[in-house]
Curated annotation (Swiss-Prot):
GO BP term, pick one: photosynthesis
Record function comment: Variable subunit of the ferredoxin-thioredoxin reductase (FTR), which catalyzes the two-electron reduction of thioredoxins by the electrons provided by reduced ferredoxin.
Protein name, per record: Ferredoxin-thioredoxin reductase, variable chain
Region entry Interaction with ferredoxin, spans: 43-46
Matches recorded under InterPro entries: Elect_transpt_acc-like_dom_sf, Fd_thioredoxin_Rdtase_alpha, FTRV
Gene label: ftrV
Family of the protein in this entry: Belongs to the ferredoxin thioredoxin reductase alpha subunit family.
Subunit (UniProt): Heterodimer of subunit A (variable subunit) and subunit B (catalytic subunit). Heterodimeric FTR forms a complex with ferredoxin and thioredoxin.
One GO MF term: oxidoreductase activity
Pfam families with a match to the protein in the record: FeThRed_A
Keywords annotated in UniProt: Oxidoreductase
Presence of the UniProt keyword Membrane in the record: no
Amino acid sequence: MNVGDRVRVKESVVVYHHPDHRNQAFDLKDAEGEIAAILTEWNGKPISANFPYLVSFSNKFRAHLRDFELEVI
């Protein structure tokens, strides 16, 4: 997976920060978005992020996900 790829969430991932469902459980399963960034370094130093893929679902909503939770469309 690379930056700019269209992806779909294939696992059940519950988030509480969705702008339309603030502070309520919202399942991202089958949601489609675009990989905005892959986090491998911070301030020039390598990092091992637990959720390295930043996926943008809309202008207002982005989420950090793992590779096994996503599939390329």
